[in-house]
Amino acid sequence: MFELNNFESIKIALASPEKIRQWSRGEVKKPETINYRTLKPEKDGLFCERIFGPQKDWECHCGKYRRVRYKGVVCDRCGVEVTKSKVRRERMGHIELAAPMSHIWYFKGIPSRMGLLLDMSPRSLEKILYFASYVVVDPGETGLNEKQLLTEKEYRTALEKYGYTFTVGMGAEAVKTLLQNIDLEQQSKDLRAELKDSTGQKKVRTIRRLEVVEAFKKSGNKPEWMILDAIPVIPPDLRPMVQLDGGRFATSDLNDLYRRVINRNNRLKRLLELGAPDIIVRNEKRMLQEAVDALIDNGRRGRPVTGPGNRPLKSLSDMLKGKQGRFRQNLLGKRVDYSGRSVIVVGPELKFYQCGLPKKMALELFKPFVMDKLVKEGYAHNIKSAKSIVEKVKPEVWDVLEDVIKSHPVLLNRAPTLHRLGIQAFEPILVEGKAIKLHPLVCTAYNADFDGDQMAVHVPLSVEAQAEARFLMLSVNNILAPKDGSPITTPSQDMVLGCYYLTIEAQDGAKGTGMVFKDFNELLLAYYNKSVHLHALVKLKVTLEDGRSSLVESTVGRFIFNENIPQDLGFVDRKENPFALEVDFLADKKSLGKIIDKCFRKHGNTETAELLDYIKALGFKYSTLGGITVAVDDMSVPEEKKVFIAEAEAKVDKYEKAYRRGLISDEERYEKVIETWTETTDKVTDALMGGLDRLNNIYIMAHSGARGSKNQIRQLAGMRGLMANASGKTVEIPVKSNFREGLSVLEYFTSSHGARKGLADTAIRTAESGYLTRRLVDVSQDVIVREIDCGTEDTTEIYAIKEGNEVIEEIYDRIVGRYTIDPILNPETGEVIVEADSMIQEDEAETIVALGIEKIRIRTVLNCKTNHGVCSKCYGRNLATGKEVNIGEAVGIIAAQSIGEPGTQLTMRTFHTGGVAGADITQGLPRVEELFEARKPKGLAVITEVSGRVEIDETGKRKEVNVIPEEGETQTYVIPYGSRLKVKQGQMLEAGDPLTQGFINPHDIVRVNGVKGVQEYIVKEVQRVYRLQGVDVNDKHIEVIVRQMLSKVKVEDPGDTDLLPGGYEDVLTFNECNKDAIDKGLRPAVAKRVLLGITKASLATDSFLSAASFQETTRVLTEAAIKGKEDHLIGLKENVILGKLIPAGTGMKKYRNIAVEKIED
């Protein structure tokens, strides 16, 4: 049985005229739509019921047959079949053209496919198609050439000279004849022969032509099908016409475009019947050709056809293109039922896995379930009466709703959903009011706050969906962030403040210091009765499970904090001190993160969720009791500030004078002034921070990590310091005041530049970052974990990433959770630290770092041999769970989200380095984009292509660097004026090392250092940008993207294979192709690995559905149709578009093909 959704692949090809007529249910002959009086469709018109089906269910046009019992009857009066009106969404019609017309996609696309096949320029083709020139179709015995263009005058001359011995033509008919005359087999042979001798531009064109010829040859498409004899008319319900109030009609633009085609076609038919003069017929044909072009792709050639108000009409192509097109609007982004949205408010009383759902909303969302339960429990006899009970909201409805909701998770989503934690599942609790209640600890993942944010609720309906929501999406199962494996549910703000206040070090002379308590309850009693202060150092008798007991000394607050915290997290060595408190230190934000991390690794998510709720409750309670607040008096301006500023002003004065006397340049003066003020600001800040009391409220807030930073305290009570102007250059007049003293008018003005730039930057950044994420997702969406082990022997050497002496990423972060191939040994004793083929755990990684091992070989995604995905050994640990990654995990999407989500935090800045040449150093988001798009960077560095010793030769202003290898020729590099050298005389260099400062062009690295070099470079450079902004992203995410950028080879010599020279092929496909050739004893193809930017890589994917829904929709579809491409639905996007389950996670074939067998008891 053929199920609508049960297919393996989808194919696209050119439609032959026969095929178009076969699809059609009838010919549309009239341009009429509906009768303005009866409002019924006109016969043979664009909405004809005889062609497209009835407008009302089970009712023919004239009303002779009504009701279901006549199903399938064709009315003898009006010819309409009695059936469901739904068929008007699927039945097509057609228009028989009076003359063939060209399809604009194949004539006008770049490169013009018709032009390549006929070996004519698009300009000549345009002249023929739009009746400006004649073309010789058959030269006969004359001296003319086939496909030669003749003007009217030349044609007359030729006629006089040769008579009617030759044939010329005009318009699409002539082109059709030429296309029919093509012998593809012969042309393919000729072109391949031509390729061997041609070079340069000629070779490029030959390759392009060969590509098109091969495409037609292989796909079974015929070239003449690029010319239309009949035009399909899409179903009327996809181009509706609706009546507005006031009797006017709103119609889809397509109806206008079809109407123009039909009108002109009918006029042409009439002219031909009348035998009108050639020139009139030609003009009509040209107009028809233009109407057909506008229908298919309005605005592609000439001025677009406009509707009322000069708005270009939306053609068939526009229906597919862009964000509002069919692909992105309706196929990839559908709206769903059983969903609601509302404002969110904080729910500190909720458990970690709960959310509050407003009663009214819950009733509406769970209506079908409630109705079902009402019938089952006997409150109603049938669904109809149950519905009325729900609509009247009788009291029993609420009891039933409580029951229904109990174990039914709902999904909460906050837009923008930047990573997978933007949708999580919760168990709903009914609340009064109209707002959704959200647990405060999941706010970080959603990036939510309570200043009016809204969230959407979705109800998983099927049992499977509920199970997936509960086991995979429940907030308890999403404690770790997928981007770096750190807990994302760390307490923030008030909670941190409370825990910090609770665990402050013992205060001398606090009430009750030195008291001893026999158990925790006694201590609590004393605290509640105010006999002992929270920060008093006291002793408490601690009894272990085995009965041993001892007195432990700490503060009251720390005893309270530790009461419900597991005492085996590993902060204390229990062999040495079995009694000490686990958390006997200041619990600031970082420490709380560590506590949660250790708890998760030791006890798993359920216990961690309980711990989180405990910390949340404590934090809120004690930040309230502590009453930590901010008053003006907390900001004490340091006494020394005046002195520092006076000193600085004197220095600046000195520099000014030196500049006036010509001792230093303006450039130097500027540098020195900036330096002086920066120093002064730091001095004032240090004095301020030193003078703050450890119990000062502002200090507590900043130091605990709850809110604010040293930088902000400096602005409040120190000095604001230097400001940047709009172009990012530092203004040399500093803001000497702080907010406590107040700014002068000039200072306020100076500060306003930066503030405005900050806001503008944020807006641009959000859009840029969103687009980057979209491209990343597109390039990596089909990377799925396909198998356990691909069996590769290849490894990558890993070491800490350094920039000069500064470590950007530690080796620890790079190796933890990765697999080894060979065992890792202790260099001193030779004992095995990590076994061969096993995952490096935290403690093992710590040992490796402690032993000072600097380089380690591990398996990475870059070496994986799995086709269309990766294997779990090469990928290593799934950061979101802390365990080995499962088969079916969509690691490509996770990688894209992990890189894209922090994108908004990166800056847009380009730093301006001083100096004559003032090279801009691209940083932040633009730099990441430059790397992933594999663009040639701004501020290029010169690199050496050989390894050897450096000799610098300076003659006048010209600098030359000679690199002398051990053997072979010396390479000389001319250093561009204004570049800064990075190498010293006599230094030894490796091939690919930069000679000057700046960025290296990644394509050069591929050439000099090969694939491994460029992989390492991109990972290193992307990490540099993210780490400098304080964002941690794991290497493996970047590696997944880099792997996709390097997944293609460019064929240089096809050998005896079917590959086309200059074509892009998948590395693994190419290797298989060659293996087959070698097995058959043929000559294998030669190709080189290419680095493609992410946009290019997405468009080069094998799946045309994925590429078409990404960008350049018409170009992708044109190419796919000519090649007769088949999409095997390997990636996620293709399956979403076709409404199938995605082949990842639980939707994988491996998990779907499970039959349930009942075993007899």
Swiss-Prot record:
UniProt keyword terms in alphabetical order: DNA-directed RNA polymerase, Magnesium, Metal-binding, Nucleotidyltransferase, Transcription, Transferase, Zinc
EC number assigned by the record: 2.7.7.6
Enzyme class: transferase
Superkingdom, taxonomy of origin: Bacteria
Stretch forming the signal peptide: none
Cofactor comment text: Binds 1 Mg(2+) ion per subunit.
GO molecular function annotations of the record: DNA binding; DNA-directed RNA polymerase activity; magnesium ion binding; zinc ion binding
Keyword Nucleotidyltransferase attached: yes
Residues binding Zn(2+) 1: 60, 62, 75, 78
Residues involved in Zn(2+) 2 binding: 790, 864, 871, 874
Metal-binding is among the record's keywords: yes
Catalytic activity: RNA(n) + a ribonucleoside 5'-triphosphate = RNA(n+1) + diphosphate
GO cellular component, one term: DNA-directed RNA polymerase complex
Gene Ontology BP annotations: DNA-templated transcription
Cofactor(s) listed in the protein's UniProt record: Mg(2+); Zn(2+)
Quaternary context: The RNAP catalytic core consists of 2 alpha, 1 beta, 1 beta' and 1 omega subunit. When a sigma factor is associated with the core the holoenzyme is formed, which can initiate transcription.
Homology family: Belongs to the RNA polymerase beta' chain family.
Function: DNA-dependent RNA polymerase catalyzes the transcription of DNA into RNA using the four ribonucleoside triphosphates as substrates.
Name of the protein: DNA-directed RNA polymerase subunit beta'
